[in-house]
Design a protein with these regions (language model features):
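Glycine- and aromatic-enriched membrane insertion/assembly motifs of diderm outer-membrane
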Residues: 32-122, 197-199, 203, 209-215
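Short glycine/proline- and aromatic-enriched beta-strand/turn motifs that initiate or cap beta-hairpins
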Residues: 3-74, 166, 235-245
Length: 245
């Protein structure tokens, strides 16, 4: 009886792309015990900062809002994968809006509006990244394949959970924090994509994603901030498949 060597097919893939986002309005909760301040900035509006729409080829690839994926299709049908999914997104509180401040500030009850501008002492950036990291399960649904297998079109479904790693920079009432990266909470996301593969190895992927993030213990001057928001994201990526045997 002849033993047969069991071969488990697999495909490693890697991609790089760029994104844009739209965020839900959200409240930022500030706690500064040493200043006797505990208040919220109510239903503030935030926006992204694409970067790739201005002189993309004249700056480092990692300065604009980018996306990185690395994954592995592990089953016989090559339709199930695990994936590390990183989105370098940016969240910036929109300058010039009238922001409601409600709670306790320096021991006094407040409920008023401020002009949220840098010249007035206010800015709030997750600008070197709101930074969503997800560990995904991926499912592939074939749509179309040419007879000679030189072109394939697939629908991809992805779902995952993971940490957020924001870069936090802000000033509130003229009091600025020390900007830094930190582990700042968690996020979960669901993503669908159309994936066009050419000659088996190169692919272009157009994705849409809904992500929900909860941030906590974000550094502000002598205190912390917390917030949560959802965002809708569009992503275009270029990738490479590597067959493993």
């Amino acid at each position: 009886m002849q033993a047969q060597e069991s071969k488990r097919p697999g495909t490693l893939y890697i991609s790089w792309g760029y994104n844009t986002e739209w965020y839900t309005n959200n409240s930022i909760h500030i706690d500064q015990p040493s200043l006797n301040s505990k208040y919220e900035i109510v239903k503030i509006r935030g926006e992204d900062h694409r970067g790739w729409d201005k002189s993309l080829l004249k700056q480092d690839l990692t300065i604009p809002q980018y996306n990185f994926r690395i994954g592995y299709f592990f089953n016989q049908n090559q339709d199930l994968a695990i994936e590390i999914n990183f989105d370098h997104t940016k969240f910036i509180v929109r300058q010039g809006q009238q922001a409601q401040i409600k709670g306790i500030f320096t021991g006094n009850q407040v409920d008023n509006t401020v002009n949220f501008t840098e010249i007035n002492g206010f800015y709030y950036f997750l600008n070197n990244g709101a930074n969503f990291l997800l560990f995904n399960i991926v499912k592939r649904y074939p749509i179309y394949t040419t007879a000679n297998n030189t072109f394939k079109l697939d629908l991809m479904g992805k779902v995952g959970i993971g940490p957020v790693i924001p870069h936090v920079q802000n000033s509130l009432f003229g009091l600025a924090n020390d900007p830094s990266f930190q582990f700042g909470g968690w996020n979960t996301g669901i993503e669908t994509a159309l994936k066009a593969t050419i000659y088996r190895y190169v692919y272009l992927e157009l994705s849409q994603k809904i992500d929900y993030s909860r941030y906590s213990n974000l550094k502000v001057y002598q205190g912390t901030a917390r917030q949560n928001f959802a965002c809708y994201e569009l992503i275009l990526s270029l990738g490479l498949n590597l067959k493993l045997r």
